[in-house]
Amino acid sequence: MSQKKIDLVIVTGMSGAGKTVAIQSFEDLGYFTIDNMPPTLVPKFLEIIEQNNDNKRVALVVDMRSRTFFKEITLILDQIEQNFAIDFRILFLDATDNELVSRYKETRRSHPLAADGRVMDGIKLERELLAPLKSMSQNVVDTSDLTPRQLRQVITEQFSSDSNSASFRVEVMSFGFKYGIPLDADLVFDVRFLPNPYYLPELREKTGLDQEVYDYVMKHQESNDFYKHLVELILPILPGYQKEGKSLLTIAIGCTGGQHRSVAFAHRLAETVKKDWPVNESHRDKDKRKETVNRS
């Protein structure tokens, strides 16, 4: 069996250009990530990944900390190319001098290469030292006019191995309004206007996952009309959320107790969405009433 290659992205560039946002984006894409790794430790780390880790997608932030940085990283890149089954790319993040100065003023942090505290001097020195590495980089991104969200979007577009599955998934959940709206919900839909199976004794103890309840909820015209509009709303916007670099979209559907109507709707929606996107289906309050009755 051929050995699976390591997919290595080395994230570097100007201090203040967005490396922290970048490494978080790679983590959302499913990469194994480490921030601020000394170049000399990279080969040993890759050896461990090669032998012991199923995840062969790795992103490392390697910062400029000394004048010997370029010499070190060049030697390391040659070494790993010779000794490992690896595909590696360098992502270089840049920004204009004025933008970098503005960011340092905003955060009130000192530049790592500004010995006398003058940020512009540190930027000029760093730019000079990194120029050869920038010329070697396969991906150069100017973040001067990018928001953090836009930078995440750029990284997603350039490094996601699968635009649907690697970087984005959907959580479809049901809940009961009487227990509170889920705090992590991105989209919330209310189905309390639909006929309630709770008032039918033969359905009261069942849930929306039981066929009898599901059929009762979905047999009404207003249920099917609402579901049609719900799908027409949700499916077209999912690519937009994925494009924005969002890794998880939580869609919450609520009824009064979270046992019947919302469960049926969440299940139906999950079955529809999973045809095109990775989906996790959950029902937060489905058994809450039963648990309350048992405790009383």
Swiss-Prot record:
Disulfide bonds: none
Residues the entry annotates as binding GTP: D63, M64, R65, S66
Signal peptide: none
Keywords, sorted A to Z: ATP-binding, GTP-binding, Nucleotide-binding
Lineage top rank: taxon: Bacteria
InterPro entries, A to Z: P-loop_NTPase, RapZ-like, RapZ-like_N, RapZ_C
A GO term, aspect molecular function: ATP binding
Binding site for ATP: G13, M14, S15, G16, A17, G18, K19, T20
SUPFAM superfamilies assigned: P-loop containing nucleoside triphosphate hydrolases
Similarity-based family: Belongs to the RapZ-like family.
Functional note: Displays ATPase and GTPase activities.
Name used for this protein in its record: Nucleotide-binding protein SUB0630
